[in-house]
Amino acid sequence: MGTALDIKIKRANKVYHAGEVLSGVVVISSKDSVQHQGVSLTMEGTVNLQLSAKSVGVFEAFYNSVKPIQIINSNIEMVKPGKFPSGKTEIPFEFPLHVKGNKVLYETYHGVFVNIQYTLRCDMKRSLLAKDLTKTCEFIVHSAPQKGKFSPSPVHFTITPETLQNARERALLPKFLLRGHLNSTNCVITQPLTGELVVESSEAAIRSVELQLVRVETCGCAEGYARDATEIQNIQIADGDVCRGLSVPIYMVFPRLFTCPTLETTNFKVEFEVNIVVLLHPDHLITENFPLKLCRI
């Protein structure tokens, strides 16, 4: 075994909030004593924006504004050049999570075109003959709970061929009537999206009913903006020809890291929507879209 470098964060779930202190230890393990040129630790939080393929070309001028946005950056020298004994050495560290000026610690979010990530990177410099060692570890930031009282916003819906937006498809569709409700389109991110759906009537047999959670990411600047919708998850809530008049429960948990409270800044936006998708025989697809507002309380 050579020399191994590891970062251990004190909290098992690695979740922190603005104003708290991130603490842990850097662990150096080696069979023999290790000569080194210093050990440093860097904490960094960045927003990485990326353009989709369909936007590239339209926004060449736009490349300049898509460089990573730095939220927080801090560096400490943990150990000056010297030697570590054989065995295991633990070096404690603490970083206060404070941002400078008017910057905000956005919530950790792993998207397709918007990525908000916080990392710790430990570097051990060594002599020319030995390779430098680096270890990176991600920690998670949750945004502050929203101020004010949370008020749910229930939505009742009726889906028929007449309510669909595409008029050409409308004429080709068999007759159907679906009713239902979502208990709230204002959603607490730690609680499931709930509601119910009832198939009142349908001339064609139903193949499947699905719930599709969609992220809508917008990257923008003075030259224009790119808005892209991509699927996060798809859940089947009914399989086969659903009994008419039967209440089908709608229940969807928001996945951690892939969702965050709805976010709007000058450079980017992260929004969420849910689609109720009904597949009819032989090959008809019916989609009803509901914008969601996610928050943390």
Curated annotation (Swiss-Prot):
Name under which the protein is recorded: Vacuolar protein sorting-associated protein 26C
Organism: Pongo abelii
Organism lineage: Eukaryota, Metazoa, Chordata, Craniata, Vertebrata
Family matches, as Pfam families: Vps26
An annotated GO BP: endocytic recycling
Complex and partners: Component of the commander complex that is essential for endosomal recycling of transmembrane cargos; the commander complex is composed of the CCC subcomplex and the retriever subcomplex. Component of the heterotrimeric retriever complex consisting of VPS26C, VPS29 and VPS35L; within the complex interacts with VPS35L. Interacts with SNX17 (via C-terminus); the interaction is direct and associates SNX17 with the retriever complex. Interacts with SNX31; the interaction is direct.
UniProt-annotated location(s): Endosome
Keyword Acetylation on entry: no
Family: Belongs to the VPS26 family.
GO cellular component labels: endosome
InterPro entries: Arrestin-like_C, Ig_E-set, Vps26-related
PANTHER family to which the protein is assigned, alphabetical: VACUOLAR PROTEIN SORTING 26 RELATED
Known role: Component of the commander complex that is essential for endosomal recycling of transmembrane cargos; the commander complex is composed of the CCC subcomplex and the retriever subcomplex. Component of the retriever complex, which is a heterotrimeric complex related to retromer cargo-selective complex (CSC) and essential for retromer-independent retrieval and recycling of numerous cargos such as integrin alpha-5/beta-1 (ITGA5:ITGB1). The recruitment of the retriever complex to the endosomal membrane involves CCC and WASH complexes.
Keywords annotated in UniProt: Endosome
Gene responsible for this protein: VPS26C
